Amino acid sequence: MAKEINSNSGLSDEQVGQSRKRCGLNVLTPPRRISLWKLYLDKYRDPIIQILLVAALISLVLAFIEHNFMETIGIFVAVFLATTVGFYFERDAAKKFHILTALSEEQPVKVRRNWRVIEIPRRDVVVDDIVLIEVGDEVPADGVLLSCTDLQINESSLTGEPMTEKSLEGGGDGAYARNVVLRSTMVMNGRGEFRVTAVGDATEIGKVAAKSTEQTAVKTPLYVQLDKLATMISKVGSIVSVAAFVLFLGHDILTNPVWGGKDYLYMADLVLEYFMMAVTLIVMAVPEGLPMAVTLSLALNMRRMLKSNNLVRKLHACETMGAVTVICTDKTGTLTQNQMQVDTLLLKQGSEHLLHLAIAVNTTAELDNDRGIGNPTESALLLWLKAKGHDYAELRKQCTVVSQQPFSTERKYMSTRVLAGGTQYLFVKGAPEIVLAKCDLDDKEKQKAQEELADFQRKAMRTLAFAYQKAEDEKMTLQAIVAITDPLRKEVPAAVQECRKAGIEVKMVTGDTAATAFEIGKQIGIFEEDNTNIGADGEMTPLEVQMITGEQWEALSDEEAYKHAQNIRVMSRARPTDKQRLVAMLQKHGEVVAVTGDGTNDAPALHYAHVGLSLGSGTSVAKEASDMTLLDDSFKSIANAVMWGRSLYRNLQRFLFFQLVVNVAALLLVLGGSIIGTEMPLTVTQILWVNLIMDTFAALALASLPPSHEVMKEKPRKASDFIISRSMGAGILFCGISFFVVMFAFLVYCERRGRGGVDTHELTWFFTTFVMLQFWNLFNAKALGSNRSAFRHFLQDKGMQLVLLLVLAGQWLIVTFGGEMFRTQPLSLKEWAIIIGSTSLVLWVGELYRAVRRAMCHQEE
């Protein structure tokens, strides 16, 4: 069909239809979307949810025997809420993300069709279309050039090459022929026309995109922890319940004479009674509020992180960022502003006006307000001119361009001949060594210029020299020396230091030269000294061990690469495969790795890392492969994400502490009640209030606690560390046993004091006291992991205030109006005051403990 195409007329409508039918739309097939029902069922893979489902099924069997379904309904509601909340938020984020990526397919593209040049959406480009490209355009499909003028293309998104000169002749030493253009690359200079040879998945970027969606088997730290917790709970619950069943049944067989008779129905009833008690123990051991707490925490963080420029695509990424031990970051755009700027301009000879004229006319760049169109270096010069109050367009009107010689890698300079004010000038700008050689300079002037240039180059700046020549002059006159830089983002050095103080190693992986990479590393604080720095083992390590090039890295065997991986701080001249290999080696060391990337070539590394961080300005393939998108492209957002992740994990620990204290106390009360022969002092409806409603409220209160900068002073937790630390476990047992002792003593007192057992009024006291103990313990849970007072920032914790109010109001309503349904009787104001005052000791003991810890820490300092 290509032979029938006239490059002047382009395709006809009929030919467009035929081509589309044969080769398809110009759209990259997104990763296979999981169906909604599969996405929802995936939430049931959570180990805690699975234990809850088993408990719910056992509870359902017992419910049919006892004709009481409240406990069963409660567990099923807890499971449904936890899974549905997680499903909703993850689906909501996915929809937002797909809207963002779909917009990119609507970018307008100029094509020749039916003898006219028209604009069509990128998705409608077909094979054999004649496409027109110019400065600032993104190439919409793969193709072969038909014509071009000074065409330079940035292929870094695909090949890593920042600038490639194109020509109609094939060949060249690059990865692709010089007459080939590739989808997703950017036109930085010149213009051209090409015939489309591949669209959609058949393009080079389409092939890379397919690789970046391969499944990986890296388990997130949180999933591993919940797995371990589920295993522990199921083991402890099973051991306690089996032991209780054997002990109580054995005691009954030894002491109850009925076992010597033939009343088998009564014996079966006793066995069933003890079995039901054992099952109740298992159900009580499972923290049914935990999945809700996890999903609420992740979902709330997801929403909040969006406000701080982090679009989280996958829920687990919120928490995994808190476990990160290594960040492998790009330089351009993340550490720097990705906006070339003139740092220093040294005027040598000639007037300022003549220099301004040279900058305005000897260029191929344009400005769209403050946005440069064309070569970034030339755009920086025009922006400098604008900042000085000069309009480059007006300056161009003051002269007539006679001829222009574009920049080329062979010549390394650009020249423009103009007629201005009746005088003819030749303006030249380019590589300093080339321009200086053309100038009339004595040794002293040349040496001074070379020293100035060397100083700029040591600071990782790009240098240019300007010169001019009047028609009657024999040699050129050095006009100016310019140092251009892609400045660091102002917030980056502080953010890097924040990460390093938090025990996170920051590694820079860049395509820049070793000298530039080293200078940037010094500026952002990756390197402390010029010669030696502290290595991964805490010892002083030579600089050559901490810096490596992509070529050197590739030459290392897997064994050598494994040994070197942790000590590397900067990798220069790196390619995408180098970054992916570094991630793999660090993961082998047990590191939790986050990776930033903006190009399609970064997609595999983003996909294989524990957390892939794409840039908002990056390619759609990079975003698709990532877990989180930095909307502002800034490294500061990464540091914020780490803080959010660590705070989230701390909040989950706080909830676990609160939840398990309730469970331990309730578990012991079931056992204790069985020992003294009384029925469970809390009814099923009361347990539902304590276990489900209060747990949900607690999840809301603790999940909504704002992130704290304090967590950034700690070292990253090990992926192998159990979510329940030793001190936390001791606190759970101490509080749980203390609450049990208080409640059990009260129960025994009431049992022995009354003649007809414990009456409803006393059981209302018991129920309210139990709830108020948990109420005050919520304050202790809030302060877990910190020696700070539980009242610190209390007025800012609106979620906590609301929950405390709801618990108090809910308890009062249940006690006052619950009646037979909740087996309660109203309490007087005096009784409420006694219960609230006495149970508040839980908080004051906690405050005293934290005050002592604070004093001890101050003494150590």
Regions found by a protein language model. Name each.
Residues G731-F746, M772-L773:
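Alpha-helical transmembrane segments of multi-pass integral membrane proteins
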Residues M1-P716, D721-I724, I737, R752, ...:
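Conserved cytosolic headpiece of P-type ATPases
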Residues D759-L763:
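Transmembrane alpha-helix entry/boundary detector in multi-pass membrane proteins
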Residues M694, F739-F740, T764-F779:
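Generic alpha-helical transmembrane segments
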